[in-house]
């Protein structure tokens, strides 16, 4: 694991590397009965889950408290917490089996200032103030902006880890939310020594904390992104 991380320009101190390895062992042990990830092959798990999650921390200063919306089995939140232990983190995931796994991982790894939110994140039910939102290829940008609007305030950052084909939804978000949000970053990048292209998209909240629109209550399909190439 260390070699793959180093090749990808990810350097972790020995205690953090040990925690990430223990998390990997737990993920592997619990995957079959908890439906945590479709990735099985070791290098794919390291690159597409751990490197993909940790690399964003090299590109942006992570806001705190930070909510990871649709975290699934803990991506990107748990690797980010391991690599950047000072952040306060909320792992938002509605599927009970995955929430059980997340709570076990938090306890077994001794992660502090981390908690789970085991319901759908919608604007009227998730109102805990946060300085940042992060989400990894869960849903269109507009839906995340809507359903986290009850928790973000002026200056809060909403960080999207996307694939390269995000232009249409990005244009829609900029057009529809110009009063409440400003696009402050749109950065294409690739995971080092791979063909995996990514886009880092960041919006900043312009208006005080309040529900932007009732349509935030619409159903969306929270999912993880282990099949992203």
Regions found by a protein language model. Give the residues of each.
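Hydrophobic alpha-helix-in-membranes signature
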Residues: 64, 75-78, 163, 187
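Conserved SAM-binding loop of SAM-dependent methyltransferases across substrates and taxa
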Residues: 73-86
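Conserved beta-strand/loop positions that form the S-adenosyl-L-methionine
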Residues: 69-71
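Short capping/connector residues at structural and topological boundaries
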Residues: 41-44, 50-51, 83, 126, ...
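S-adenosylmethionine
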Residues: 87-229
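Class I SAM-dependent transferase core
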Residues: 1-67, 97-114, 219-225, 229
């Amino acid at each position: 694991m260390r070699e793959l991380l180093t090749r990808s320009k990810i350097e972790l101190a020995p205690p953090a590397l040990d925690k990430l390895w223990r998390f990997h062992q737990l993920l592997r042990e619990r995957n079959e009965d908890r439906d945590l990830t479709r990735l099985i092959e070791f290098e794919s798990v390291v690159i597409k889950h751990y490197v993909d999650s940790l690399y964003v921390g090299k590109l942006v200063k992570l806001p705190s408290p930070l909510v990871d919306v649709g975290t699934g089995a803990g991506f990107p939140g748990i690797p980010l917490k391991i690599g950047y232990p000072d952040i306060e983190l909320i792992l938002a995931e509605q599927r009970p089996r995955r929430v059980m796994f997340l709570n076990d991982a938090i306890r077994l790894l001794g992660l502090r200032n981390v908690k789970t939110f085991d319901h759908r994140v919608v604007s009227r039910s998730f109102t805990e103030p946060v300085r940042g939102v992060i989400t990894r290829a869960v849903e269109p940008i507009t839906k995340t902006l809507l359903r986290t609007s009850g928790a973000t305030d002026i200056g809060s950052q909403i960080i999207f880890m996307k694939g390269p084909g995000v232009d249409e939804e990005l244009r829609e978000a900029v057009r529809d939310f110009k009063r409440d949000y400003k696009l402050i970053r749109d950065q294409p990048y690739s995971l080092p020594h791979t063909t995996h292209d990514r886009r880092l998209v960041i919006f900043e909240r312009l208006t005080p904390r309040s529900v932007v629109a009732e349509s935030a209550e619409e159903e969306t399909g929270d999912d993880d992104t282990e099949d992203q190439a």
